[in-house]
Amino acid sequence: SGADAVLALSKEVSGSEAAFVGLMNKRAKEMGLSSQCYFQNATGLYHSTHHMTVKDMGQIMALAMQNPAAREVLMTENYQMSPTNKHAQGLKFTNLFLQRIKTQDSGGTRIEMAKTGFVSQSKFCVVSSGKGKNGRNLLVVTGGSSSTWQAVRDQATLYKLFSE
């Protein structure tokens, strides 16, 4: 993700990225996120004053799980866009995390949705949710993984541990 979509969205919704970030910070307060939570940009790219805790990420995912449109996006493994004048074949988007986690032992947990991210300061990060074999909803947030595959293994290990 090159963040072009969120930049276009921020301009459409608020007129500018800065105004959109103001809405993001307002919403963070309304959601009861930590006092440390502060957005400096809409993309999530590193900025020295851009802060979020692991708990904040979990709270955002928990709220996203309740939103039908967000659920649909976060649960989609593959999406094929229709052709456009710039991409005659359309574009294909793939959530590699959702595909890769299926190759791991997650203790019988069915991982349903995930959002991955990377910035050099926090390495590979994932927030995901799934349903344990006992029917319990689980939400896992990890950061600091050294590679995309390590992030998958870290998540699978935690799902396995907490699904029992």
Predicted feature descriptions by range:
Residues L7:
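A short acidic, helix-capping loop that chelates divalent metal ions and anchors anionic groups
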Residues D4:
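Active-site-proximal cofactor/substrate-binding loop regions of enzyme domains
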Residues S1:
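Short helix- or helix-capping micro-motifs
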